[in-house]
């Protein structure tokens, strides 16, 4: 199929998810027409909600403004991808944690904190820091600091909530909780990946 295309084309794949990038819209439309038939030969189908054609790249923002719209975005591997500009005004791609992934991660933290709230504080700290470290290692992208900081702050609140529920009579005030955090600090958010950027029709 690729030799029949007008311009450049690329595929980004992970497991059964993939992004097809095309230099020209005509190529993208051609592949979108042919792909379902190719899949049928192998007993496969395209996901109706995930399969769509969008303009994404250095010209997308300008073209969207002409139509009074915002550039389209797409979700892939737990991130929302957005058209953006660097400090020097060049096109780049920004990512942020998908809201549903953020909620899922926080629910897992809350469920764990509830179940193990009676364990010693230092043991809870070690496990929570391991969970935070794993979150930062995956989501710690240069343009995603706001999201991982939001995750950290919510985890701090969740931990206080469940530590407070194990005390009888005297609630765990923020002042007392601040002392616990100084003695047993939670891992601060940090960027763990180098900067990358790209763009085209996707």
Model regions: which residues?
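Non-catalytic terminal/accessory segments
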Residues: 1-202
